[in-house]
Swiss-Prot record:
Its EC number is 3.6.4.-. Pfam families: AAA, PEX6_4th. It comes from Dictyostelium discoideum (Social amoeba). The gene is pex6. This is Peroxisomal ATPase PEX6. It is an enzyme of class 3 (hydrolase). ATP binds at G959, P960, P961, G962, T963, G964, K965, T966. GO terms for cellular component: cytosol; peroxisomal membrane; peroxisome. CDD domains: RecA-like_PEX6_r2. Belongs to the AAA ATPase family. It catalyses: ATP + H2O = ADP + phosphate + H(+). Component of the PEX1-PEX6 AAA ATPase complex, a protein dislocase complex that mediates the ATP-dependent extraction of the PEX5 receptor from peroxisomal membranes, an essential step for PEX5 recycling. Specifically recognizes PEX5 monoubiquitinated at 'Cys-11', and pulls it out of the peroxisome lumen through the PEX2-PEX10-PEX12 retrotranslocation channel. Extraction by the PEX1-PEX6 AAA ATPase complex is accompanied by unfolding of the TPR repeats and release of bound cargo from PEX5. It is found in: Cytoplasm, Cytosol; Peroxisome membrane.
């Protein structure tokens, strides 16, 4: 296929259906027995190529992948075409048509693409238009064979054609064979290589019968598109089959219709209420989120039955992908070309000034091509965008020059400066959902308007500022038609500057030792309109080897910059316009706009300065994070997850940035604590980017030194460097390491002088700035991050004026994170995957853990599909799996979740839901019911406790050892879907003072973060003995008991945390533990006193055994003594299995069984159990059992009282 697809890119040419059928289906000269349909693509084939490169007869062995180019380009710039191989593509069948191209024609048309021919029906199905550019790639048909296909006949005639009437009418027909297609229909599908794509309709033409039959593809498995073979399971369903009522798609369709109606109503309301404030918008978002969660929960309840989908009744679980494979049709038409005029028609339309509403423009997705979707003259970083209706109402042409004036400063400032910008205005398609009567300005243009900081923050939140800005139309000169430069059209009333001086704005990403001449030269290739104090931004991206050599001439000597500061990284560098000189015009108020033309203007870069920067400029510059350069934009938006904490930090920092209204003689210091990986550093970076201040980030491990004087010098050096680039948010990661000293590392609790060091350094810096008239007045915001407050001394903590804690995400926050992570992934949501349930099962997972979970699930899904396809054909590759498409199933996520929970639980003791059911617990029926009343009732009916009556969340299980206390606690957690945190008393005891109490606090903190959760304290008597009776002189155990009691009292406020304790000796426990409100529900787990209960225990323990037919468990139980515990019965079952092992091994050694019998499953016989019973010794003697009965009477009486 090399010769046929050597060009890869082709142009679409659409033919009328009748003409297409006549040429390429019925009367094709290429192949008299062709199977072409209206949905076949005809590819040109030049006979003049070397025949050895391509054999036309092999086309019957191939399909092709069709990839549509989403960006419009000129045919003269074919090199700009980019093919992304790891995306889902459309699988289509094809045929060839012979063409004859001479060498001369080839030489003249090197830049022209060959055309592939499709029918009008095919163009509608594939959403293709004339002159669309597509990429074609062949794939062998055998690699796309599906394992299962489910078809719904659209009419009875189609069903009769494909089904087997004789079998379906038989009374002995199984439900499986009833839905299988007949062999004639199967053979027709295989011989003609019919393509199936879910959930599309398919029309099968039978030329022999001169009929067509129509079907809807309900499912393709495991790929989302492919063909069938003789081994494929093909299911056919009648249109009037009752089984269709079980499909959840009906409910989904109704919900979608309701959602569409609601969306239409919301759009109408939005059009009528353009001036609503932001608080109302936030309330609506919260309400929508809550409604969405409620609908998700309702859907989960409804799908308890609906989840038994169609194929559950036929063969085995399938995938319903009706909601996941629908491709979004991007509107790439030229709907707004009516208002895209030629430059010669641009000019002033009206001299009236208009008050306008402005908002900050969000980053435009990379799928939108500026040149074709907006205009080739559009400057993304400067020009404004509006809706087409707004452009009409302003009586403007697309690309008109306008002046926007900030009229609020006239009232607030005494200097009466008028801050204004001159930019172009463009309209864009409705894909960005721009509101009418609003001008959307990029961050740089908003910043250069010198908006007061209060409105600056509003705009950074994408709010709309009304009636504070004035729009004035500008008259522009007519460009030279013979000049190819598109930037000749500029306003005529702005003079050209003779000289401009710019200075580099100091921050951590820019260096005074590095030259940015190449980047600046590239920036000023276009003419610019600038005024004094404007900000310009460039990227340090290196485009060629010459720039790389020049950029490496000198290195930055800063040893504390993070690793992002290398020469090959793509950071943004900001420059400020300091001085503009012009002979024709005198700059009186410093706000005159000038034209900067590199041919006549001298551009000088000199010195450095301090300034704020535009809000969210990095994500805007890199267009939302799809570029590799914007690494942080691929993160989950933590400002929406931790909304309250984010707002608190912004409110604390804002007064320090309002220098004209507030003046402080101290620094803003903020301590941020939370578990590692929760997102502390990321959240602070988001704060800085929104507020328009620089970030200076340092890892304190680089500052630490065993020599105190050197460590102090490192701290001073970092603080001085950060203060030189203000306004700066200094982030000191792992701050607790600076508290360590040589003595503290040896467990000697000696406080460091860190707080005094910080006080002295900041005092020196502030005194130096105060005495220096030329020093900048911007603030230095000091923030530190720690993983635990326990690592800091009280003296250091008191130095910080504010403390903020980031806890692990709760259930609702995890739901938001998972929704964000899965929004662009092909996940089987609603059928096998529930985001709501997944958010419940990922308790204690952090943002990084959830991201890793989704990544692992995608890999597991790819492995699953790859293994299935390779069983049928081992030539398929992962990239071809991507092209065909596949779904991430619930099993893939469950496997990844189990792996991660296993690792987390073993490494950090994170809670997880166990896998123990009631079937694993034999007997104990009365205890089960009492426990479920205590735990399950407040979970399922929380409204019953809304009146203020406290719930009873503490249970104490006591009794002889081996009676199933731990197993029962795990079963409770499993049945109630609770996370289970098992704690053994001796594990919490530590030899150092205060460490044992700290361990108890951490256990309860983990449980709160992982709620709903059960904390199970095993061997509780070793952790909480009676106070005053301990032998330790230091009173360690007394303090431990007091800490435990304090935590138990605090549990009454947490409605979803339950405490279960287990002990063999309740008489040794501190009596305060068993008062009401703590462990006030005492349950005795004793030895079974009836043979029926013993039988249930043994039955539960052997339910996974391969028992012989002669095994009678009741007879086994009759031979057992009455003082056997659950652990004794476990030993009995284990000994019986061991006896069977010994018998098998002995027979194998003696040659009594052959190899085939050795590989058979191990079977346990009656004699194995009898032998185990005869050798069993009870673990609890009769005297001990009598003692436990006395204890039961004592504490059961106390419990009743």
């Amino acid at each position: 296929m090399i010769g046929l697809f050597k060009d890869e890119w082709f142009n679409i040419s659409i033919l009328n259906d009748n003409l297409f059928l006549k040429r390429y289906c019925y009367e094709s000269n290429n192949n008299n027995n062709n199977n072409n349909t209206l949905y076949t693509i005809i590819v040109p084939f030049d006979k003049s190529i070397n025949p050895s490169q391509f054999d036309p007869s092999t086309i019957n062995d191939y399909f092709i992948f069709l990839y549509k180019n989403t960006k419009k380009i000129n045919l003269n710039s074919i090199n700009k075409l980019q093919y992304k191989s790891n995306k889902k593509e459309i699988l289509v069948s094809f045929d060839i048509t012979y063409i004859h191209n001479s060498n001369n024609n080839n030489n003249n048309n090197n830049n022209k693409l060959k055309s592939v021919l499709i029918s009008n029906s095919c163009s509608k199905k594939l959403n293709l238009f004339n002159n669309d550019i597509v990429h074609l790639k062949p794939i062998k048909k055998k690699l796309t064979v599906l394992q299962r296909v489910v078809l719904l006949a659209n009419d009875n005639e189609s069903f009769i054609e494909s089904s087997n009437p004789s079998e379906s009418s038989s009374s002995t027909t199984t439900i499986n064979s009833k839905y299988l297609v007949n062999e004639e229909f199967r053979n027709y599908l295989v011989e003609n290589s019919i393509l199936f794509q879910s959930p599309n309709n398919i029309v099968i033409e039978n030329h022999q019968k001169h009929k067509s039959f129509s079907y809807k593809v309900l499912e393709c498995f495991p790929l989302l598109q492919g063909t069938v073979s003789n081994s494929t399971t093909i299911i056919i369903i009648s249109p009037d089959d009752k089984i269709l009522n079980t499909l959840p798609s009906n409910n989904n369709n109704n919900n979608n219709n309701n959602n569409n109606n609601n969306n239409n109503n919301n759009n109408n309301n939005n059009n009528n209420n353009n001036n609503n404030n932001n608080n109302n918008n936030k309330e609506e978002e919260v309400e929508e989120e809550e409604v969405e969660v409620e609908e998700e929960e309702k859907d989960n309840k409804l799908k308890l039955n609906n989840n038994l989908r169609l194929s559950n009744f036929i063969i085995h679980p399938i995938i319903n992908i009706s909601n996941n494979t629908t491709t979004k049709n991007e509107d790439i038409g030229d709907s707004n070309n009516l208002f895209h005029f030629t430059p010669s028609s641009k000019g002033i339309l009206s001299n009236n000034k208009k008050f306008i509403n402005i908002s900050q423009l969000k980053s435009i997705p990379t799928e939108i091509d500026f040149e074709f979707d907006i205009s080739k003259e559009y400057d993304y970083l400067v020009d404004c965008l509006v809706s087409l209706n707004t452009l009409k109402s302003l009586n403007l042409f697309n690309g008109s020059w306008i002046k926007i004036k900030n009229i609020t400063n006239n009232n607030n400032n005494n200097n009466n400066k008028e801050y204004e910008i001159a930019i172009r205005i463009f309209s864009i398609t409705s894909s960005l959902k721009l509101k009418d009567q609003v001008l959307y300005l990029p961050p740089i243009s908003i910043f250069n308007l010198n908006i007061d900081y209060k409105n600056f923050l509003k705009l950074s939140n994408y709010e709309i500022i009304s009636n504070q800005f004035e729009l004035i139309l500008l008259k522009s000169n007519k460009p030279n038609i013979n000049n190819n430069n598109n930037n000749d059209s500029f306003p005529i009333n702005y003079p050209t500057a003779n000289r401009i001086k710019i200075s580099r704005i100091k921050n951590q990403n820019s260096s005074g030792y590095k030259s940015y001449s190449h980047q600046l030269e590239k920036y000023f290739q276009k003419k610019r309109l600038l005024k004094q104090n404007d900000i310009i931004v460039i990227s340090t991206k290196v485009n060629n080897e010459e720039e790389l050599i020049n950029s490496n001439n000198s290195n930055n000597n800063n040893n504390y910059n993070n690793n992002n500061n290398n020469n090959n990284n793509n950071n943004l560098v900001y420059f400020k316009v300091e001085i503009i000189l012009c002979n024709q015009f005198e700059n009186i108020n410093g706000n005159q706009i000038y034209l900067i033309d590199k041919n006549t203007t001298s551009i000088i870069q000199e010195g450095s300065s301090n300034s704020m920067v535009p809000s969210k400029i990095e994500s805007f510059y890199w267009r939302g994070g799809d570029q590799e350069e914007s690494k942080d934009n691929s993160m989950v938006p933590l400002e929406l997850i931790y909304e309250n904490e984010f707002k608190t930090i912004v409110d604390l920092i804002s007064p320090f940035l309002m220098g004209d209204k507030f003046s402080f003689d101290f620094n803003c210091t903020l301590l941020l604590n939370g578990p590692q990986g929760v997102g502390k550093r990321t959240l602070l970076n988001r704060v800085a980017k929104q507020m328009g201040i620089h970030v200076y980030e340092v890892d304190c491990y680089k500052l630490y030194d065993f020599v105190e004087s050197k460590k102090d010098w490192n701290i001073r050096n970092v603080l001085e460097q950060a203060s030189n680039s203000t306004p700066t948010l200094l982030i000191l990661k792992n701050f607790e390491v600076l508290e360590q000293t040589a003595q503290s590392m040896q467990q000697e609790k000696k406080e460091s002088n860190l707080s005094q060091t910080l006080i002295n350094i900041l005092k020196d810096i502030n005194d130096s700035n105060t005495s220096n008239i030329n020093s900048n007045k911007y603030p230095l915001i000091i923030t530190v991050t720690v993983n635990s407050m326990d690592e800091l001394s009280n003296k250091v903590r008191n130095w910080f004026k504010h403390e903020i804690t980031l806890n692990s995400p709760d259930e609702n926050q995890r739901f938001k994170i998972l929704k964000y992570l899965t929004k662009n992934l092909p996940i089987d949501i609603g059928n096998t995957v529930s985001i709501k349930n997944l958010s419940i099962r990922t308790a204690s997972f952090l943002n990084s853990n959830l991201r890793a979970l989704i990544q692992r699930s995608s890999i597991n899904a790819l492995k699953r599909v790859l293994s299935i396809q390779q069983m049928m054909n081992d030539e398929i590759k992962p990239i071809e799996i991507y092209n065909c498409g596949f779904l991430v199933m619930g099993d893939d996520i469950q496997k990844s979740l189990s792996e991660m929970q296993e690792y987390q639980s073993s490494s950090i003791g994170a809670p997880k839901i166990p896998n123990v059911s009631w079937d694993d617990v034999g007997g104990l029926a009365n205890v089960k019911s009492e426990i479920m009343d205590t735990i399950q009732l407040p979970l399922e009916h929380p409204h019953l406790f809304a009146s203020g009556i406290g719930k009873r969340s503490g249970i104490l299980l006591f009794g002889p050892p081996g009676t199933g206390k731990t197993l029962l606690a795990k079963a409770i957690a499993t049945e109630c879907s609770l996370n289970f945190l098992s704690v053994k008393g001796p594990e919490l005891i530590n030899m150092y003072i205060g460490e044992s109490e700290k361990n108890i606090r951490e256990i309860f903190n983990k449980a709160r973060q992982a709620k709903p959760c059960v904390i199970f304290f095993d061997e509780l008597d070793s952790l909480a003995p009676s106070r005053g009776n301990g032998a330790d002189s230091g009173g360690v155990m007394d303090r431990v008991v007091s800490q435990l009691l304090a935590e138990l009292d605090g549990m009454q406020k947490s409605s979803d945390v339950f405490i279960i304790g287990a002990t063999n000796r309740p008489d040794l426990l501190d009596s305060s533990l068993m008062r009401p409100g703590r462990l006030d529900r005492l349950l005795y787990l004793g030895i079974s006193s009836e043979k029926e209960n013993q039988f249930k225990i043994l039955q539960a323990l052997t339910r996974k055994f391969n028992l012989a037919d002669d095994v009678d468990l009741r007879k086994v139980v009759e031979n057992c003594p009455m003082n056997l515990t659950g652990a004794d019965f476990y030993a009995l079952a284990s000994d019986a299995m061991s006896n069977a092992f010994h018998e098998r091994i002995t027979a194998s050694i003696n040659g009594e069984i052959n190899e085939e019998e050795q590989n058979q499953k191990l079977i346990v016989y009656q004699n194995h159990f009898i032998k185990a019973v005869n050798s069993l010794v009870p673990s609890v003697s009769l005297d001990e059992l009598e003692y436990y009965h006395k204890v039961q009477k004592q504490f059961s009486g106390n419990n009743k009282s």
